[in-house]
Amino acid sequence: MGMRIKKDDTVKVISGEYKGKIGKVLKTLPKEGKVIIEGVNFTKRHQRPTNQYREGGIIEREAPIYACKVMVVCPNCDKPTRVGHKKLESGEKVRVCKKCGEIIDKV
């Protein structure tokens, strides 16, 4: 089953420790059913010094969260909503807000 959340979507966490937080999707992991959201679900990683990380040490970064725990925030009505798909008369597919019926973006 495909994910209805895409990279750069604004989403709101609807359950769990970070309930109510809003952030932008940095990456989707469709095989795992997870997404990585900016500013949500930080974990600490022990990083060995390498060329990329000169100092190393303990680094905080975002960890994946299940996609079923987030909802897309509609850019038109600014409410968390389910996402539907619709085919326009021109033949192109678009994502649609289930609350206000407005087009979110192209698929």
From Swiss-Prot:
GO molecular function: rRNA binding; structural constituent of ribosome
Pfam family, one: ribosomal_L24
GO terms for cellular component: ribonucleoprotein complex; ribosome
One GO BP annotation of this record: translation
Keywords from the UniProt entry: Ribonucleoprotein, Ribosomal protein, RNA-binding, rRNA-binding
Signal sequence, renumbered to the chain: none
Keyword Transport appears in the UniProt entry: no
Subunit structure: Part of the 50S ribosomal subunit.
UniProt record similarity statement: Belongs to the universal ribosomal protein uL24 family.
Primary role: One of two assembly initiator proteins, it binds directly to the 5'-end of the 23S rRNA, where it nucleates assembly of the 50S subunit.
Protein name: Large ribosomal subunit protein uL24
Biological source species: Kosmotoga olearia (strain ATCC BAA-1733 / DSM 21960 / TBF 19.5.1)
Lineage per the UniProt record: Bacteria, Thermotogati, Thermotogota, Thermotogae, Kosmotogales
